[in-house]
Design a protein with these regions (language model features):
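Flexible, glycine/threonine- and acidic-rich loop/arm segments that mediate assembly and lattice contacts
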Residues: 1-311, 316-319, 340, 365-372, ...
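Disordered, low-complexity "stalk" and linker segments at domain junctions of extracellular
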Residues: 303-444
């Protein structure tokens, strides 16, 4: 029972605290009580400079833990960025060539002495633009002179700046989209959707490169199907990258299938057995697939309507007009979503996101071929929106709108003519100009994942310069510097990548 706690002996200074010890002092009991009251340590921090302390608090030395405790992410949490193949870029526009076909797959056998027919190979040149990530840090001269528990404060702030950049870069590998915010690079989801073989959103979502789980968890058969699809596209699936919850739910599917033999001499060690399931790879029919999780692959979490803008430079919240049910929509996917919903929308630019605005009241989907047209406009303000985030509640909410968690389901460009994304100016997913149509393609509260051939034949990050620290001119007694990253991811072969969408949870 030793070492369970400290005791009074660990705090002795001189005579101690017992009655016999106090009796050795030439003080009466009343005097001792007054002295004890006068020098009571209290719970005030030693750094209190109010000048009003009437006890021993002013004499205390602070007890500060010597090491800095992290309550945010660590470098080890940035996983996909570390795994992503990287190479040098030499221009702000990185071009690449694709050989898309050796020629048509026609008959090729000929008669003796006959001239074979001619076939032309097909080449395509494409490009991605290098984009620029950066953050400015500042440390005053005075801060550099005082003692801290973090060592060199400039080095600490440099590390913090690097981690801030890497978090943004890691997340943008998935969700970056220059058609939404033009300063962003195109992440893997954007480049996958930009595949030229699909003319519109219907063709893309119905293709074999997108596997829609409609709220179900990811299972073995989904991976096998994806691996087979990639094989038919002349690719070798070897990497699944997903948010942690997707892989956790994949593992829990095995719990009910586990068999543990308890008892018997051959199982003497089961008394301290470890349960659970760790899955690092999946053996498909066509090869091993590594499992990799990344917390920054997760979608933005749901939030309440009272959530404030994320930046003082974010646009003003949009002005809502209406949410109208559209009947007889042959492309609707509300067959599994008949019920009531709330809708909301926020505006975004390169600085951040506005507060959200409710669009309409409760919207009722009564038929499988219903869809919803949302009408809203930009609100005048100092900062113009580049795009809008559409939010939706889960089906049949039991609380009023202001107490209901709203989930982002799509991001809509403010302007543009892209046939897959659409835009508010020209209509989204079959809606008229100025409207955004929700056909239940994207389910609230779900996740996404990617299955791909994770090598330089398919993906690569082209980096214009190493991650760098650049000093700024001194305009005050402070060291200011920037942490900068220039580059862009490139998906050379979007057809060698499977996108799992609407992955649900196993609660």
């Amino acid at each position: 029972m030793e070492n369970l706690s400290v005791n009074l002996a660990d705090y002795q200074h001189g005579a101690g605290f017992d009655g016999a010890a106090m009796g050795q002092a030439n003080l009466t009991a009343d005097q001792l009580a007054e002295l004890s009251k006068a020098l009571e340590a209290g719970q005030l921090q030693g750094g209190d400079m109010s000048g009003n302390q009437t006890n021993g608090g002013a004499l205390k030395t602070e007890s500060l833990e010597s090491s800095l405790k992290l309550i945010t992410f660590k470098e080890s949490d940035i996983r996909f960025w570390k795994r992503f193949p990287k190479t040098a870029a030499f221009n702000t526009v990185e071009e690449y060539n694709q050989l898309t076909s050796y020629g048509s797959d026609r008959g090729g056998f000929n008669n003796e002495g006959e001239l074979p027919e001619e076939e032309d190979s097909k080449y395509v040149r494409k490009a991605e633009h290098v984009k620029y990530l950066g953050v400015t840090k500042s440390v005053t001269h005075q801060m550099q002179l005082v003692n801290t528990n973090v060592g060199d404060i400039v080095r600490r702030e440099t590390t913090n700046g690097i981690l801030w950049i890497l978090r943004k870069a890691d997340r943008a590998l998935f969700t970056g989209d220059e058609k939404v915010v033009k300063q962003e690079w195109n992440g893997l989801y954007a480049q996958h959707m930009n595949n030229d073989q699909f003319a519109n959103l219907d063709e893309y979502m119905d293709s074999e490169l997108v596997i829609d789980l409609r709220g179900s968890v990811l299972k073995q058969e989904n991976l096998e199907k994806g691996a087979q699809t990639l094989l038919n596209k002349f690719a070798q699936a070897n990497l699944l990258i997903a948010p942690p919850v997707v892989l956790s739910d994949f593992a829990t599917e095995f719990y009910a299938k586990q068999r543990v033999m308890i008892g018997g001499s051959q199982n003497a060690n089961t008394k301290g057995m470890t349960t659970g399931q760790h899955i690092s790879k999946f053996q498909s029919m066509y090869g091993l697939i590594d499992f990799e999780y990344d917390i920054f692959a997760a979608k933005a979490p749901g939030k309440l309507s009272v959530a404030p803008a994320s930046s003082s430079k974010a646009p003003s919240a949009p002005t809502a007009v209406s949410a109208d049910v559209v009947a007889n929509d042959g492309h609707s996917k509300f067959a599994d979503g008949i019920g009531d919903y709330y809708y909301a929308v926020s505006a975004i630019n390169r600085y951040g996101e506005s507060a959200m605005t409710q669009v309409g009241n409760t919207v009722t989907i009564a038929n499988a071929d219903d869809s919803v047209d949302l009408t809203f406009t930009a609100t005048a303000g100092a900062y113009t929106p580049n795009a809008y985030v559409v939010y939706r509640s889960l089906k049949d909410p039991s609380t009023p709108f202001n107490k209901t968690t709203m989930y982002p389901i799509m991001v809509v460009p403010a302007a543009g003519t892209d046939t897959k994304r659409g835009s508010l100016a020209n209509g989204v997913d079959g809606a008229a100009a100025g409207k955004v149509r929700d056909r239940n393609r994207w389910l609230p509260g779900t996740e996404e994942a990617l299955l791909l051939q994770g090598d330089t034949d398919v993906i690569e990050f082209k980096q214009l310069a190493p991650l760098m620290k650049m000093p700024l001119a001194k305009l005050s007694p402070a060291d200011r510097f920037m942490v900068l990253l220039y580059g862009t991811p490139i998906v050379y072969a979007p057809s060698k990548m499977i996108r799992f969408v609407n992955i649900g949870r196993n609660f």
